[in-house]
A protein has these predicted regions:
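Conserved alpha-helical scaffold flanking the Walker A/P-loop in AAA+ ATPase domains
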Residues: 12-15, 66-88
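Walker B catalytic acidic pair
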Residues: 27, 89-90, 101
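Conserved beta-strand position immediately N-terminal to the Walker
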Residues: 23, 86, 124
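Walker A/P-loop
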Residues: 14-55
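Dynamic helix-loop-helix/coil hinge segments at AAA+ ATPase domain boundaries and subdomain interfaces
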Residues: 1-9
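P-loop (Walker A) phosphate-binding loop of NTP-binding proteins
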Residues: 28, 62, 129
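Canonical AAA+ ATPase core
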Residues: 69-72, 93-98, 106-175
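Short loop/turn elements that form and flank the Walker-type P-loop nucleotide-binding site
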Residues: 11, 18-20, 31, 44, ...
Length: 175
């Protein structure tokens, strides 16, 4: 067990994933948000992609981009979102323009680059993390984006006994 003492949050998250809904994890750094996403990808055998959202991340980093090919046409280079479970880590640190690159993917299951739509693998789930609004370098997510999430969770700090169990699991070689 990777996240000890978070059974209710894990059950809610699993239900959202099985329903092909998207999850917004809002919490302080270091409580297991990223670990939770990676654990679900491994446990459910889903192709995992992750982008650490910072102010310099571009929409094309997410959706992909076109490059000239030797035949004189354009060739598509997939972005980080072309996977089954995409972790948008610290989403509220990115610019609004970059955040909006997720909207089509979350709503329609595709991305459009240079007028050409590219379907996302199925199932497709976004787990986005965000630090609490007001933390340095963060901005409020727009309602149009928050509306795309099926579930919004917080994890909180583990209880001392749960933290000790996690340390013991790590020492035993479990993730």
């Amino acid at each position: 067990r990777v996240l000890v003492g978070k059974d209710e949050a894990l059950l809610w998250a699993l239900a959202a994933i099985l329903a092909r809904g998207h999850i917004l994890l809002e919490d302080i750094p270091g409580v297991g948000k990223t670990t939770m996403a990676l654990s679900f990808a491994r446990a459910l055998d889903l192709e995992y992609g992750r982008i650490q959202f910072t102010p310099d991340v571009l929409p094309s980093d997410i959706t992909g981009y076109s490059v000239p090919d030797p035949q004189g046409g354009l060739s598509y280079r997939p972005g980080g979102i072309l996977c089954n479970l995409f972790l948008a880590d610290e989403l509220n640190r990115a610019t609004s323009r970059t955040q909006s690159a997720l909207l089509e993917a979350m709503e329609e299951g595709q991305v459009t680059v240079d007028g050409i739509s590219h379907p996302l693998p199925q199932p497709f789930v976004v787990i986005a993390t965000q630090n609490p609004t007001g933390a340095a370098g963060t901005q409020l997510l727009p309602d149009s984006q928050v509306d795309r999430f099926t579930l919004r969770l917080t994890l909180g700090y583990p209880a001392p006994k749960d933290e000790a169990a996690m340390v013991k699991n790590r020492q035993a070689g479990n993730p």
